[in-house]
């Protein structure tokens, strides 16, 4: 029987690559729901190719545009079209799906992920912000419902694979690798342009995660994600800069052995691993040639120039709603940088300033997390930044 798949964020970088994986395994998967924002033309193309029963978009206007496109081209194919928060949750809980790939950007992934877990769906998690903002709620819900949280980030997929069959108590350190971004080795970030920051040396990604990689905030969020996914204290999670991005992460055990996962810089590999789990599907990505590669290098991150890693440790130490505030403030800071409102270094200023103003609520429920998220976004939009 084909595995039913719902994809939240199907028109983004991860979503489109996931559909490519599914296209390469036609006998294994069936797409039952696709959710996107406002890229209705791309969603219409995906819908005509995979013919899911349910489509969801950002709002009623996007739904009307999508419906018009499909009426013109779809023949007898008549999917249900939903929109907004309700549509996203309906896609996440579609009765025919066994696995939900959550690849929407930002904290908007929290509610549909929790809804999917409550509906008993396994989760292929590409939305790290969900665990950053609501890690305790999400992991507790997954454990209570007996569903799997399967990481899609290449680093967390590597850790997941390296931990296979291991006693969690035997872990000494998680070694989380980072490319270092486009500004590795640069001490002065004054004057960094939008174009420079969007030029990642290794990975092709969406704009938000590319900027996060340039500030090392992506790695900061991944530290928090690893903390919740694997139950490892932050002090046992070490970030190591690895410019080649071939060793995707590793686990050091109490006996001194280190187990790592290596592979090409192609997100279709960890996506395929999560979709096929617990099996391994036959690969179609060009395999890694270690002889041609020649050498792998490693170095410490520069936390003075790139303070994001410190912000992550501070957020988890303070606990409660502080990680959600870190995440929300960063999302707005990146938006403001991309819009030309603040300089690149203003991202750090803005995030630190919003965190300084927040008094975290301990052991928050979903309502408290969402309230903190809204507060942080408002604060980040209003906060002045030195130019």
Curated annotation (Swiss-Prot):
GO molecular function: 1-deoxy-D-xylulose-5-phosphate reductoisomerase activity; manganese ion binding; NADPH binding
Alphabetized UniProt keyword annotations: Isoprene biosynthesis, Manganese, Metal-binding, NADP, Oxidoreductase
The keyword NADP appears for this protein: yes
Enzyme Commission number(s) of this protein: 1.1.1.267
Record pathway: Isoprenoid biosynthesis; isopentenyl diphosphate biosynthesis via DXP pathway; isopentenyl diphosphate from 1-deoxy-D-xylulose 5-phosphate: step 1/6
Positions annotated to bind NADPH: 11-14, 37-39, 127, 129, 206
GO biological process: isopentenyl diphosphate biosynthetic process, methylerythritol 4-phosphate pathway involved in terpenoid biosynthetic process
Cofactors named for this entry: Mg(2+); Mn(2+)
Catalysed reactions, semicolon-separated: 2-C-methyl-D-erythritol 4-phosphate + NADP(+) = 1-deoxy-D-xylulose 5-phosphate + NADPH + H(+)
Record's keyword annotation contains Ribonucleoprotein: no
Top-level taxon in the UniProt lineage: Bacteria
Protein's job: Catalyzes the NADPH-dependent rearrangement and reduction of 1-deoxy-D-xylulose-5-phosphate (DXP) to 2-C-methyl-D-erythritol 4-phosphate (MEP).
Protein name: 1-deoxy-D-xylulose 5-phosphate reductoisomerase
Gene: dxr
């Amino acid at each position: 029987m084909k595995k039913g798949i719902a994809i939240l964020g199907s028109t983004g970088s991860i979503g489109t690559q996931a559909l490519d994986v599914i296209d390469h395994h036609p006998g294994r998967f069936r797409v039952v729901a696709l959710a996107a924002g406002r890229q209705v033309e791309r969603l219409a193309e995906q819908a005509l190719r995979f013919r899911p029963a349910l489509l969801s978009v950002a709002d009623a206007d996007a739904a009307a545009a999508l419906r018009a496109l499909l009426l013109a081209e779809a023949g007898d194919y008549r999917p249900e079209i939903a929109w907004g928060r309700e549509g996203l949750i309906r896609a996440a809980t579609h009765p025919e799906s066994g696995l939900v790939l959550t690849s929407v950007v930002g904290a908007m992934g929290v509610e549909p992920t929790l809804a999917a877990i409550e509906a008993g769906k396994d989760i292929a998690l590409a939305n790290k912000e969900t665990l950053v903002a609501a890690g305790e709620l999400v992991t507790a819900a997954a454990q209570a419902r007996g569903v799997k949280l399967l990481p899609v980030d290449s680093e967390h997929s590597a850790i997941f694979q390296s931990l296979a069959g291991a006693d969690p108590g035997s872990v000494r350190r998680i070694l989380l690798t980072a490319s270092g971004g486009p500004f590795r080795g640069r001490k002065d970030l004054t004057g960094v342009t939008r174009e420079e920051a969007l030029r990642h040396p290794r990975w092709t990604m969406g704009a938000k995660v590319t900027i996060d990689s340039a500030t090392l905030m992506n790695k900061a969020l991944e530290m928090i994600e690893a903390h919740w996914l694997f139950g490892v204290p932050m002090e046992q999670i070490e970030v190591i800069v690895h410019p080649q991005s071939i060793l995707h992460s590793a686990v050091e055990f109490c006996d001194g052995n280190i187990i790592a996962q290596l592979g090409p810089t192609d997100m279709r590999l960890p996506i395929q691993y999560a979709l096929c789990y617990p099996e391994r599907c036959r690969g179609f990505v060009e395999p890694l040639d270690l002889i041609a590669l020649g050498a792998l290098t490693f170095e410490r991150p520069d936390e003075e120039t790139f303070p994001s890693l410190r912000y992550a440790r501070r957020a988890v130490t303070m606990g409660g709603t502080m990680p959600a505030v870190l995440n929300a403030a960063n999302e707005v800071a990146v938006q403001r940088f991309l819009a030309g409102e603040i300089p690149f270094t203003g991202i750090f200023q803005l995030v630190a300033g919003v965190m300084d103003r927040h008094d975290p609520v301990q052991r928050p429920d979903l309502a408290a997390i969402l309230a903190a998220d809204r507060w942080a976004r408002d604060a980040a939009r209003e906060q002045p930044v030195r130019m």
